[in-house]
Amino acid sequence: MHTSSFEKIRAFRDAYLEPSPNVVLSVLDVGSLAHEEQDTYRPLFAGVRYSYTGLDIAEGPNVDLVPRDAFDWREVPSRSVDVVISGQAFEHNPYFWITLAEVARVLVPGGLTAIVAPGGGAVHRYPFDCWRFYPDAWPAACGYVGLELLEHAMEQRPADPRMTGFDWHDNLMVARAPVFTDGTEEEAHYARLAAIVATRAAMPVSGTDVRTGPALSLYEQRRTTICPEVRPEAVNPTKDWMRAMVADARTRAASVVHRSR
């Protein structure tokens, strides 16, 4: 795990989680498997104030629970977890929106989730690499599963040059599970989550970097001889627009000079 991801979850913990001495917060880490002796979030939730459980689709270091169905965690009761965290996992998840629906289901009313996922970076399969998360990703995803998005941002510059992982342009989001006062609305919410989970399919087979067919083959043959951007019918309208923009700018500048006199 890169240090900037670790520090984002640490900041989430310090900003949002203030358990009282008599309350133990349950923490579920989705995608917790430690690859090649990587660091994990577990140390952030050690001690008597937290009860940490690492969930992943495969057994291994830092994994406490492997659900029988990767997208339907029947081993985790609904409304049973105070905090769900995840880092460097959602980009590998072929159906991340289903997993987010499960996050919403297992959270207690008012429970919190913090997820770190990249907005850039190279292909890295564990065993898949499906997605990147841009600034509009989390508002759309949280709205889909009924979570209240509290904050989100994609990292555009290093917060500290000593940290590793800036090249992933991580996107951190913090969201809260809804608290219902109307039983009908609550029932509809959980029914919708169940319907989303029911759309899951079998885990796909990992693909190759390129699966070439007739369209890509034809493109490869043509790309050195045809460039739509330099064809006259594509370029001329752009030239006209640029000329008009420059002429307008000159007119505005002349008007400003005239008024200043």
Where are these regions (language model features)?
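Short N-terminal micro-motifs specific to bacterial/archaeal maturation
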Residues: 3, 67, 72, 87-90, ...
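Low-complexity, charge- and small-residue-enriched intrinsically disordered regions
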Residues: 248-261
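S-adenosyl-L-methionine-dependent methyltransferase catalytic module, highlighting the catalytic core
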Residues: 94-244, 254
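N-terminal short leaders/motifs
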Residues: 8-11, 85-90, 125-129
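Class I SAM-dependent methyltransferase Rossmann-like catalytic core
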Residues: 1-21
